Amino acid sequence: EKKKPNCKIMGIGTKNYGSCNGIIYKNRSSVDYFKQVAEIEDYGYILLNQQWKKAWGGDYIDLLTPAMTDQNHVRVFTDDNRYISQDCRHLTPAGAQWYAQILDWKNIFKEKQPRYQ
């Protein structure tokens, strides 16, 4: 099927919130529980995100970078202390709401410019 005129196709990035929420949950009694971050143990996620970002250019929705706190750590909790992901891969409703607040929707849905003229 052909793409409809004025239709915008976007690449949507990968996500990774550590290897197991149990690692975070076991520290639930600590004072800084909600400040914990998770390590991205598989660097392939970061490389894949970089490759897709380069390939898709302005038509890429990067979900990994906004969650990163440094080169290989990501947030686990939203600003209101709710889990972003229940299983380290899929978003909780709170995680989806967090992304809805932080992503630049005006930029994502701006009118598409032709790649080649």
Residue ranges and their predicted role:
Residues 1-117:
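Extracellular glycan-modifying ectodomains
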